Amino acid sequence: MKKNIIVGSLIAAVVSQISAAAFPDVRSEIQDGDASLQGPIALAFENVVKNHVLRQDPVYLSECFKDRTEVDFWQTEFWGKYMHSAAPFWSITKCSQLKPRIDAGFENVVSAQLENGYIGNYIESRRSAPGGWDVWGIKYTMLGLLHYYDIEKASNPERAKRAIDTCKRLCDYLIKTAGPGAKYTIAKTGNYSGQPSCSNLEPVMWLYNRTKEQKYLDFAKFIVSQMTEDENGPRLLDLAQKGVPVADRSVLPKRNSIWSGVRTNRGKAYEMMSCYQGLIEYYEVTGRKDLLDAAVWSAKNIIQEEINLAGSGASYEHWYHGAKHQHEPFMHTQETCVTITWMRLCEKLLSITGDSVWADQFEKTFYNAYLASMHRDGKLFAVYTPLDGTRSEGQIHCRMHTNCCNANGPRGFLSFIRSILQSKGDEVFLNYFVSSRASIKIPVLGKKAAFEMHTHYPKLGEVDVRFRIQEPMKFKFSMRIPACVKVAKFKVNGEFVTSGIPENGGYVTLERTWNPGDAVVVDFELPVKMHRIDDSIAFTRGPVLLARDSRFCDGDVGAVMRVDDIEKMFADGKTMDFPVEAFSNQDDMRMVVSARLPVGGHDENRDRRAFATVKFCDYASAGNLWSPSNYYRVWFPLSHNPAKLMK
């Protein structure tokens, strides 16, 4: 990570480059309730709370725990996933309608716990056994109980104790049935070489951090050994140390379906990242840096070989070297659970490493793949969100009126809101640019600093940050400069800062005594960059992927672009400016830009050779009518020159 320190007077200061420690102390995030959004992102969040979370019935989602006849499905994840967002959202919004629903769901879950501690819906012979999703469901049930504990511990200690005691009994059951000495240890249960089951490491670490009971850390250590030492297990450590790409960690049988080899496959994207999330939690307590290094290496491999221009990846939820295939029509791409888990992993790695690359990745995913997965009124989340075609609701899962991605979808907003600001020592980090008011505690000072931000980013480049502190405070203020933008202007209290700003992403750190009303104003240029794979091209503007949409009625959204002209326009990495413009259906689209481009292949006809005006919207807005008549595309074919075929 590159940082620039500006000390004392901002105009006369000497700016120096420093390198952050490889893995510095963990940054703190915004506490739930200490941030409020404004503008279009606030509207999207409000729609999710109002039209999705409030319309879920947690009693219905948890009723499956009382019908213990399952042998294969995963419906026991739904209540825990609901709580993964609903409980923190209540802390953020204090919505009076939400809390009673959360309480009712909690009571239903507690009432379903068996005497031996089990909460689930599997028949006894299939519990903690090979195949199925029983142990995976326990993971989400523990997470849900711990979220409930977190929102009750300050105001209702009795309920908080019931939540933590219920979670402890469930974890004790898991230790007995899948821990040391069990018939099937945890990596032998479930599917995908035990990855789904071993991802229980995250809630086990949460439970240890809240209780400090050694038996839970001991169980976490056992799960880590199962993840890393079992030859037939997930092998999340040695395969990373050997440099094996995430897509190449499985030995699969010959197959016509990606689901073949479901018991032994190690390439399941969602579950692999969930395991690394747990390993990072374990590193925070034990200091086992080899585990963190494996997580970082694997995440960087995901960036290099899997993540597409929309910030997500996977086909049929499996890694497949997808970055180089993203222009091709692979089936079932970009599952929303994969998208959200990637966001959570980036959020965690940002707080641990301080490396701005994780914020860059998170931002790209949030503004593209994540927002694209959401119905524009927030009521639904898609299961898959392709890079071209149309958008639609996913199928129902497990004989219930929901699915895994609908249950998981709202969680992405929580990661975004919590990590707008982070702090460590005497430093505040501004990671994301969204109109908002937020405060965060500065550990060294023991006080909170409040900020107000106004911006239309990423549609427009200006970001205005006001310091809403109550008294002068001396601390470092580090502002992220995204790698995908250029800084046109950087001002502090009206005075220009002209040096020390990283060109390829990083943080600018301003160290001084801040006064109430101080202002940092930055104007980013948002260059349009062309991306090419084989004979297909796509365009990004800043962090936003651009798409043609049928609502523009400006021709075939998949029209060929003339290769010779395009190559001249973007020669040697040149970027362009696609100006923002108004559109009659502006409420449907967050951003519309246009450009004169060489569309069509009839270069022998002067009129057809002329460049045409082409409109683009942000990928997240493309196809958001969720109608078969509203189609879109982000990758465009180039015309071919037969000369390249000649020897």
Which role does the model predict for each range below?
Residues 1-4:
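Positively charged n-region of N-terminal signal peptides that target proteins for export
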Residues 8-17:
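Bacterial N-terminal signal peptides
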Residues 21-96, 100, 128-157, 197-215, ...:
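Aromatic (Trp/Tyr) and acidic
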Residues 82, 96-135, 306-315:
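Helix-terminus loop motifs that line ligand-binding clefts
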Residues 124-135, 142, 160-195:
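Asp-box/WD-like beta-propeller blade repeats and closely related beta-sheet repeat scaffolds
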Residues 178-237, 241-246, 262:
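Solenoidal tandem-repeat scaffolds enriched in leucines and small polar residues
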Residues 485-512, 530-534:
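Solvent-exposed beta-strand/loop surfaces of large extracellular or lumenal domains
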